[in-house]
Curated annotation (Swiss-Prot):
The organism's place on the tree of life at top rank: Archaea
Gene3D superfamilies the record matches: 6.20.340.10
Gene label: rpl34e
Disulfide links within the chain: none
Keyword rRNA processing: no
A GO term for molecular function: structural constituent of ribosome
This protein's name: Large ribosomal subunit protein eL34
Keywords assigned: Ribonucleoprotein, Ribosomal protein
InterPro entries per record: Ribosomal_eL34 (IPR008195), Ribosomal_eL34_C_sf (IPR038562), Ribosomal_eL34_CS (IPR018065), Ribosomal_L34e_arc-type (IPR047868)
Family membership: Belongs to the eukaryotic ribosomal protein eL34 family.
Organism from which the protein derives: Methanopyrus kandleri (strain AV19 / DSM 6324 / JCM 9639 / NBRC 100938)
GO aspect biological process, one term: translation
Length: 113
């Protein structure tokens, strides 16, 4: 009978063959899933996967990419967010200063409710 701490399924069961020919069970902590993008749910590149203890001891460059929203959003979603923020700020300024030029392919944002 395994010890009570091993009876839960929070540990992975790994079957090992010993040199004597017996098969024994080793209990290992499960590896967490890869970090996902907060917007689209895709797997984040350049972000380490591991338990909190492993992440705590890892160097900063392995934990997340060195860019805005690195480790939270994938590059495509971060690019979209930054562009949307810039566009929103432009139209906010345009409302305050109507003399700013508007290019023909630009459309004003939808009014917020």
């Amino acid at each position: 009978m395994p010890a009570p701490r091993y009876r839960s399924r929070s540990c992975r069961r790994v079957y090992k063959r010993t040199p004597g020919g017996r098969t024994v069970i080793h209990f290992e902590k499960k590896i967490p899933n890869w970090p996902k993008c907060g917007a689209c749910g895709r797997r984040l590149n350049g972000v380490m996967r591991g338990r909190n203890v492993e992440l705590k001891n890892a160097p900063k460059t392995q934990k997340r990419p060195n860019r805005p929203y690195g480790g939270v959003l994938c590059p495509e979603c971060a690019r979209k967010l930054i562009k949307d923020k810039v566009r929103y700020k432009f139209w906010e300024r345009k409302r305050e200063q109507p003399w700013l030029p508007v290019l023909p392919d630009e459309e004003p944002p939808e009014p917020e409710e």
